[in-house]
Amino acid sequence: MPKLEEIDDLEDIDNLHMDLAELDASLKTPIAPRLKPTVVRSQDSEPPLFPQIPLEGEQGPSFTFIDPKSGRVEETTKITKEDLADLKRFQILYPCYFDKNRTHAQGRQVPLELAVANPLAKTIADACRELEVLCVFEGEKTHPQDFGNPGRVRVLLKENGKAAGKYANKRWLMKNVAKYLQEHPTTLESLREIPYGPDFEGIEPSKIPLVHGFQMNEIVPLHSPFTMGHPMTKGIYTAPKVVAPEKQIKAPKNKYKVVRR
């Protein structure tokens, strides 16, 4: 006589200790490898906004050197970590140090009688070359209080604890640089002497409109975020076109003639 066996609920298929997705449908192995979830972001599949500009991390730090003899700006050169450590011995000059429209709290470091309007880092580099001071021009670096005027200059004043040139301290050098800036005021033509990338070819320099209550210069390099030539902000001053709404045609009123009898 056949026997009836009771099946415990623990042996139900819904109480397995393994995921059903781990079962190998091909029956070649008892258990298939567990699938690892992957996160795919939509922005990873999109093309870069500016493909000609390398992403951060794909290129090392680069600097532009000024030839002390000819005064010409050499091509941008990538620097190794060893060279970068040597550059830390250089002191830094920012354009806002010489800006007459700024107070000392806003970044000015020279006396007001020596300050100038619209100072540029390229002119500061020209002054250091004229003063026979070893300098490095960094066109992309900015001061936190003057982010709209990119560019700074590294100068070597001391070597092994001794003066590297005739200027023993930074204050003395800045005084002579300020005199050079006064003799060479900034104009729109000065912007053509700054090295730019291919994105700025054909862009004519122009003064930017000043914003009331905001500290800024009217003559800044073309790659400044304040200019209309910058790829990211070139349309910031363009007023959007106002589209006039279409006139709605009113439906004619129904007129009734009342006839009295």
Curated annotation (Swiss-Prot):
GO cellular component, one term: signal recognition particle, endoplasmic reticulum targeting
SUPFAM superfamilies: SRP19
UniProt-listed Pfam families: SRP19
Superkingdom of the organism of origin: Eukaryota
GO MF annotations, alphabetized: 7S RNA binding
Record key words, sorted: Cytoplasm, Ribonucleoprotein, RNA-binding, Signal recognition particle
Subcellular locations according to the entry: Cytoplasm
Gene Ontology BP term (one): SRP-dependent cotranslational protein targeting to membrane, signal sequence recognition
Physiological role: Signal-recognition-particle assembly has a crucial role in targeting secretory proteins to the rough endoplasmic reticulum membrane. It must be involved intimately in the translocation of a wide variety of protein substrates.
Family affiliation: Belongs to the SRP19 family.
Name of the molecule in the record: Signal recognition particle SEC65 subunit
Organism, scientific name: Eremothecium gossypii (strain ATCC 10895 / CBS 109.51 / FGSC 9923 / NRRL Y-1056)
